[in-house]
């Protein structure tokens, strides 16, 4: 019989709606969660104790030190405030979206590459995984379900590092969603804003079918 996996050390960067919801889900799943923003850690602790009981509020360098997973939950226009040195080598969830109609035209994202590829180029040494961008924060809180639940929702993920995707897949599963691997980071184009996946809710089989339609290639059944 295999021994239980140890809890993940999860650093959540950002204390907005998305960051606090994911921190709560991670705490509920039994993980060691550290929350950090650019504000003073003592000031953040006052907010964190109320919004996310069980989380540790700290500085960004301390939050990311030794973390198994980092969640970049900052607004897109602030992605360049992410500490590249602190994130180097880490599995990093990018859940940011580029909405030209909402954010206005941002020239660096007006390119053939996906927003995640642009962000991954900036982060350089980080192992970026695109996920959780096609589900709203309120749905994260309301739609998570235990494994095997027939109403469990699927979440797509894409990245170039298989080990990072394995960590992210475990995290998604343990907070209540079925992870479906879309492929490399560029495959995240299949669930950017304006796509059927971005605008819909799917179980794992349906998600694989949608990804196959988008990519015109088979998605592994164990994804």
Regions found by a protein language model. Name each.
Residues 84-89, 122-124, 147-149:
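Short, conserved loop/helix-junction motifs that constitute active-site signature segments
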Residues 1-49:
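NAD(P)+-binding Rossmann beta1-loop-alpha1 motif at the extreme N-terminus of oxidoreductases
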Residues 52-103:
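Rossmann-like NAD(P)-binding element
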Residues 96-146:
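Rossmann-fold NAD(P)-binding glycine/threonine-rich loop
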Residues 150-223:
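Active-site-lining helix/loop region of Rossmann-like oxidoreductase modules
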Residues 57, 127-131, 180-182:
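General beta-strand structural signal in soluble alpha/beta enzymes
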Residues 21, 25, 122, 171:
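Rossmann-fold NAD(P)-dependent oxidoreductase module
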